[in-house]
Amino acid sequence: MWKLRTASSLILLILLSGGALAKTSKVIATGGASTIEGSAGGGIVPWAVINGYASSGEWSATAMLTSVSVDDFSLRVVGASLAIDNRFEFSIAKQTFDLDSLGGELGQDIVGVKYKLAGELLYSAIPQLTLGLQYKRVDDFTIPQAVGAQDDSGLDAYVAASKLFFDAIAGRNLLLNATVRATKANQIGLLGFGNTKDDSYQWVFEGSAALLLTDNLAIGYEYRQKPDQLSFATENDWQDIFLAWFVNKHLSVVTAYTDLGSIAGYENQQGWYISIEGAL
């Protein structure tokens, strides 16, 4: 399993390598950041982009550390990804969800794959389109089962479309993304999958907008619709306002103010998000 020291070591290795291990040629910021589920995107929404800066015939790798702290809970994520030919993305992530007010923790492992179907982010008439899969499995099914979840693992599938519009607002470039996801996950999987009365997939929408203030600095907004399947507590949609700084092609930092709504009966869960990613 991915531990904090493992991800930290990977990021340090990436920064010290100075890109010596991988030749990459994509434009800075076009690989996005790493989401809390490990795939390329913003913070809570996967985009159609492929992580890192590998173009055709190239490869790249990333490692990330993420922390989200809201009123009664905190989430820690470590992960890594591999991109090949600007078409395939493979990712892994380990989530640890601390129940700060209740005591204890939940966790899950996520393995993801993404494939570019068509289009380009920058220089094509149609947006970049990707198909993604995320297999998730909780560490301990005791609490999810107690609150009514049906399964301890599940598979999310999504289609994402991303496009960068040049000189869109006050001469600045604007990235728009739309994602449609089929999922059974409760609280992105931390509370299991489905419920004892309905184990069917739910269709949800996720969207992002990012305005590039400079070539390597962006502000944006994300919205993630959530299924509401467990009777013991309402599950609200998520949203955030973020600032992303792509220091160079090997280091990026994303911070955000997040509104996660009601989680496990605790209302108005709001707080801060920070993520650091190193890329080869």
Region spans (language model):
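Short, flexible coil/linker elements and helix-boundary hinge sites characteristic
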Residues: 17-19, 80, 171-172
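Cleavable N-terminal export/targeting peptides
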Residues: 1-33
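C-terminal appended segment following the main domain
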Residues: 240-280
